[in-house]
């Protein structure tokens, strides 16, 4: 299923590990990144901007690192 704007998504930890994005940032990921669901607020190319239900900035992740939450 293709991810689109407004979808609720989960981050796939295995796909994020050792990716370029993971190597460029702190490896101590906050728990909400994998335990919660985020909302896709924008999509540009292969990346989606995700807003989580906690008071933090949005994050950009590759679409293949995300899955639609059930």
UniProtKB/Swiss-Prot annotation:
* EC id: 7.1.1.-
The UniProt keyword set, sorted, is:
Membrane, NAD, NADP, Plastoquinone, Quinone, Thylakoid, Translocase, Transport
> What GO molecular function annotations does the UniProt record carry, in alphabetical order?
oxidoreductase activity, acting on NAD(P)H, quinone or similar compound as acceptor; quinone binding
Q: Which domain of life is it from?
A: Bacteria
Q: How does it sit in the membrane?
A: Peripheral membrane protein
What GO CC annotations are associated with the protein?
plasma membrane-derived thylakoid membrane
Q: Which EC class heads this enzyme's classification?
A: translocase
Matching InterPro entries: NdhO
Q: Which reaction does it catalyse?
A: a plastoquinone + NADH + (n+1) H(+)(in) = a plastoquinol + NAD(+) + n H(+)(out); a plastoquinone + NADPH + (n+1) H(+)(in) = a plastoquinol + NADP(+) + n H(+)(out)
- Indicate the principal place this protein occupies in or around the cell: membrane
What subcellular locations does the record give? Cellular thylakoid membrane
Q: What does this protein do?
A: NDH-1 shuttles electrons from an unknown electron donor, via FMN and iron-sulfur (Fe-S) centers, to quinones in the respiratory and/or the photosynthetic chain. The immediate electron acceptor for the enzyme in this species is believed to be plastoquinone. Couples the redox reaction to proton translocation, and thus conserves the redox energy in a proton gradient. Cyanobacterial NDH-1 also plays a role in inorganic carbon-concentration.
Recorded family membership: Belongs to the complex I NdhO subunit family.
How does the record describe its quaternary structure? NDH-1 can be composed of about 15 different subunits; different subcomplexes with different compositions have been identified which probably have different functions.
Q: What is the protein name given in its UniProt record?
A: NAD(P)H-quinone oxidoreductase subunit O
User: Source species, please?
Assistant: Thermosynechococcus vestitus (strain NIES-2133 / IAM M-273 / BP-1)
